[in-house]
Amino acid sequence: KFFKMVFSRAGIFVILILIQLLVFLGIPYYLKEYATFIYSAMSVMEIVVLVYIINTEGNPAFKMTWMLCVMALPVIGTVFYIYVHLQLETRFVQNRLAALRMETEPYMDQDEKVTEALWASKSANAQLSYYLSHQLGFPTYRNTEVEYFPVGEDKFASMIKELEKAEKFIFLEILKRKVNEGVEVRFMYDGMCAFDLLPYSYPKKLQKFGIKCKMSNKIRPFVSTIQNNRDHRKICVIDGQTGYVGGVNLADEYINEKERFGHWKDTAVLLRGDAVQSLTMIFLQMWDVDMRGVEPYGKYLTKKAESLNDRLGYVIPYADSPFDHENVGEEVYFHILNHAKKYVHIMTPYLILDNEMLTTLIRAAKSGIEVIIIMPHIPDKWYAFAVAKTYYKELIEGGVQIYEYAPGFVHAKVFVSDDDTATVGSINLDFRSLYLHFENGVFIYDNPEVQKVEEDFQNTLAKCHKVTVTEVRNRGVFMKVAGQVLRLVAPLM
């Protein structure tokens, strides 16, 4: 069993990483006769790197983590920081994504009549619409039906039904039979799946069936920051008319066919109409990252409705990238918290916050807004749960109510506010989702389904246990100490 583990893909990957780290550690040892010169040079370099870190753009929490590494391990930390910030692969992906955004821009134009109506309805949301459209290229749409799914089982059943209707193309991880019917099927999944879930040759296997398959951001046995930037998006597009967004992955536990951490609570939304066009472009942008040319994007677009349906409100599909210097998911969450009048209700599996998000949550609560966060009671990652609990006391004392889902694990990523605004997607309240991963979501305003999101929140809340300050203080010594220590490296979690 030991040798099987060592010579597995994961084992070999870890061994190669360790070899590279040993090289970093070994160089100073073997050059010890030049130690005085080397360490003098490294001291100067350490100061230069620290000054550089302080003056770079970015989240202060990440800066503090890097500074801690450089000061605690001057040689290793300094060399490692320089190494990871001089990688060409990261720059290539960044430049390629920027170019693809330019290519898809003509297909994601903003209808000014829609934004004029939104300004008349709610100016604050019109400002968010302007930001998402003008800074990032994500238009606001009307004429889009929304259907909310309170559990993964409902989303999966709906998705199977819609996939059966496909006549032209499907962007999803599925459907050998549909390929035989002449439907174009594309399947893209994150490279982390090949680490322990799927064979490395899985794309070739699907390609034999006629399914176009890609592994996004392959795991490679080299120390590289880009391996931190996982594709966490969940998108399904069918014929350019129907799309799915949410937290539900394609695995048995997400539809409670397999129990891992009690009942798995997850959510998703179906979009049908004009807004699906953005989902199509978001998918194709990611698909084309490692291609030389560009897609004939026009063939995947459907004609927009000519008349406006006021009853359906406004829908903005959006995506987040770690390479565009815009923290889109976090900005959407800030917007909802800062413009709420009555309440903000949140479901998230993780709670690892920077100071700005922590302050915004507490400020909203102190302003008279009912802020409630539902967390899992049975976590999937004990260490992330330990860190999350280090925020509980400050949040509760600041007026934020925290509940834990007694039946099991909450994987939903939902904000709902004031019976008229909601966002559902893949974006957790942690550093990885907000800053490091490729993510996506949909902002919904003045659509009847927002009421269903709030109804689901209340139904879920009825199954939860309210966390008190006394309970937080009395948690186990191990979890308390582990959480406080791990919080030092929270930006890496």
Spans of features found by a protein language model:
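Short Asp/Glu-rich motifs
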Residues: L197-P199, T225-I226, N355-E356, Y383-A384, ...
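C-terminal structural cap/anchor segments
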Residues: I369-L429
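A short, conserved beta-strand element enriched in hydrophobic/aromatic residues
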Residues: D266, M347-T348
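Helical hairpin unit composed of two closely spaced alpha helices linked by a short loop
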Residues: A340, Y350-I372, P376, K381
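Generic enzyme active-site microenvironment
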Residues: M188, M347, I374
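N-terminal localization/anchoring segments of enzymes in phospholipid and broader phosphate metabolism
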Residues: K1-E330, H335, H339, R363, ...
